[in-house]
């Protein structure tokens, strides 16, 4: 099938700075893909490629050039994807898969589920971006007022003792039955101090921690997951 993929770059602006252990985001560059085919002139499929700077494994200095090259290859292959070759570019694979599936479904409702039919919701956590103590506390209180009962905090950017104090403040007012707490370090801890920090965090009755150390340190991560008193959820490690 003859097809065409148009690449549309955009810069999105955060309504408020989004802090992580790798820095604070105020903008986000994304590339939208428009998948079309002359055979079906009224159809279009839209996908989004959005690698996170300093976090995504395919955050490349020549990302735009790589994306353009891959899109031309997909056009030459009639819209077929080389899944094995694209595994190292997960954000590009996601954008292409979404655009192509959207094109052939002809609808944003890609799956027939109670959620897509508007019959049921999906429980999610209230995400708290990094900031100073008072700013994070204000975010938490706002999420709880909105009805969230699972709170996830980004940690690793401010002083660890301040982060502990913030978690202790929450626990002093709400038990684990009232509020489920999760934390995400985005690889902020070093292998040498990670275990001590995990032990201290575990005393606060947390549900889990995501990515305590940077991805790719498999032996260290294996040791931590086997010895940590706090359950570890893999995040960047899985990409």
Task: Briefly describe each language-model feature range.
Residues 1-181, 186-188, 195, 199-203:
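N-terminal capping/lid subdomain adjacent to the active-site entrance of alpha/beta enzymes
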Residues 216-239:
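Catalytic alpha/beta core domains of metabolic enzymes, predominantly
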Residues 133, 191, 217-221:
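Short, well-ordered alpha-helical microsegments
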Residues 185, 213, 236:
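Active-site proximal loops enriched in glycine and acidic residues that flank catalytic Cys/His/Asp
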Residues 205-216:
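A short, conserved beta-to-alpha structural element at the edge of catalytic cores
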Residues 180, 206-207, 231:
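Hydrophobic "anchor" residues on beta-strands that sit immediately upstream
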